[in-house]
Amino acid sequence: MKAYQRQFIEFALEKQVLKFGEFTLKSGRKSPYFFNAGLFNSGRDLARLGRFYAAALMDGGIEFDVLFGPAYKGIPIASATAVQLVEQHDVDVPWCFNRKEAKDHGEGGNLVGSPLKGRIMLVDDVITAGTAIRESMDLIQANGASLAGVLIALDRQEKGKGELSAIQEVERDYGAHIIAIIQMGDLIAYLEEKQAEQPELAVQLAAMQAYRAQYGI
């Protein structure tokens, strides 16, 4: 695990974006952890979040032309990432987002910002079922662009309805690379590191390991 990944886990815990416990997911599964990126909800949080996304993007090494943030959650993340790519890495890239409903007046259309062309890096919080990716692909392809990759905060590394995870299905269907700031394996490694000084984490660690054994890929 790299330093920025460990720092991101601690940031997510500090903001209660990441919680350990018992949570029922939309799928009906009982999960030993929950991740809600909507709780990164201040200016400082968003600036820090953008730095982590930018670090992961630079670390991933995938070439792209435009950052795209799908409405709604992807919009502030793509914006913050674009800002921090300049501030932290001196990399200036165009970015854009879509409207849920196209305007029929003014500038019109359903895209705001840079034209959606070339190799697109889609930016979002997590991939759960891959629905947002598939909807975005319709827009990307309609503009004659291609999907270079997907940048997310967390890869849960768990099976969907079949043997593949939603992320693996996206990789298979679109040939796109997925970059995640952290994966479930990083959360387990973090708990293993911290258990020596915080023995009470043993329960959470065991629950995470059991969950991975049952649903992991």
Swiss-Prot record:
Pathway in which the depicted protein is active: Pyrimidine metabolism; UMP biosynthesis via de novo pathway; UMP from orotate: step 1/2
Presence of keyword Manganese: no
GO molecular function: magnesium ion binding; orotate phosphoribosyltransferase activity
Cellular component terms (Gene Ontology): cytoplasm
Keyword Repeat set for record: no
The enzyme's E.C. designation: 2.4.2.10
Catalytic reaction list: orotidine 5'-phosphate + diphosphate = orotate + 5-phospho-alpha-D-ribose 1-diphosphate
Cofactor (UniProt): Mg(2+)
EC supergroup of this enzyme: transferase
Entry keyword set: Glycosyltransferase, Magnesium, Pyrimidine biosynthesis, Transferase
Annotated GO biological process: 'de novo' pyrimidine nucleobase biosynthetic process; 'de novo' UMP biosynthetic process; pyrimidine ribonucleoside biosynthetic process
Binding site for 5-phospho-alpha-D-ribose 1-diphosphate: 26, 72-73, 99-100, 103, 105, 124-132
Residues that coordinate or bind orotate: F34, F35, T128, R156
InterPro entries in the record: OPRT, Or_phspho_trans_dom, PRibTrfase_dom, PRTase-like
Pfam families: Pribosyltran
General function of this protein: Catalyzes the transfer of a ribosyl phosphate group from 5-phosphoribose 1-diphosphate to orotate, leading to the formation of orotidine monophosphate (OMP).
HAMAP family referenced in this protein's UniProt entry, alphabetically: PyrE (MF_01208)
Subunit structure: Homodimer.
Protein family according to the UniProt entry: Belongs to the purine/pyrimidine phosphoribosyltransferase family. PyrE subfamily.
Name this polypeptide is given: Orotate phosphoribosyltransferase
Gene that encodes the chain: pyrE
